[in-house]
Amino acid sequence: MIKYQLNKNYENIKDFLLNIKDYFKNNSNTIHKARNELKVIEYKGIETVVKAFKVPNILNQIVYAYFRDSKAKKSYQNAIKLKNLNINTPKPIGYIEFYRNFLFKESFFISEKLDYLFTIREPLRNNNLKDREEIIKKFVAFTYNLHKNCVYHKDYSAGNILVFKNKNDEYDFSIVDINRMEFKNIDLETGLDNFAKLWLDEDSLKLIATEYAKLVNINEEKSINILKNCDIKLKSFVEFKRKIRGKN
């Protein structure tokens, strides 16, 4: 059994979606492989990024079959929501889920490939990058717009924020890995805490907190202190987990 949804703008590549397991297996253009795997696959002149989610354990095969939406489905639905809010994310093409013996098995999310310059990691780590400060300030404005639209990306790490030039030749941003998102009102601390996973140095932290303070119209020092506390809390938690696992 399969379940799927295909964006109406891509009806001409329905065959690609329905046979994605074969196309994925026979393609060697892997761009990321960890828990999940991403490949760039061209079909009928469209460059796509196909994300194959890891088959879950037996308990979660039951959970995803009957009680919870899959990560592939949430990725697609969240992409549609973002597009409706005019927030950049690669164009969603569709998702598909495969079931065997009434259990959830493989799942895939397909989007159009976005050509980008680099991830936000580059300006955050490279102080000599051209237009660094401009990019970071625009990134803060982009994030503020997410929060203003009640969008909270729960995996807002540097590798999930793509930097590109838009049609006006201005720096712009696009978010990926969007299956874990919440749509809710975002208060000041929650908004600043959203930056913590970027693993900021002192200079970037102050610049981001200062710019965010201007946008939300609060005292800059207050904003810096809140983000510092969020940053320390996350780094301490990660360090604690490393020690528990014996990775000093």
How does the language model describe each region?
Residues 113-115, 166-168, 203:
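Short loop segments at secondary-structure junctions
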Residues 18-118, 148, 246-247:
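Conserved ATP-binding subdomain of kinase catalytic cores across diverse folds
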Residues 72, 78-88, 121-159:
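Conserved kinase catalytic-core helix
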Residues 94-95, 158, 168, 225:
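Proline- and acidic/polar-enriched loop/turn elements at helix boundaries
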Residues 1-28, 241, 245:
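Juxta-kinase regulatory segment immediately upstream of eukaryotic protein kinase catalytic domains
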Residues 38-41, 49, 141-183:
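Active-site acidic catalytic loop and adjacent metal/ATP-binding pocket
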Residues 59-65, 121-125, 185-189:
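Short acidic, glycine/proline-rich loop/turn micro-motifs
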Residues 170-247:
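C-lobe/activation-segment region of protein kinase-like
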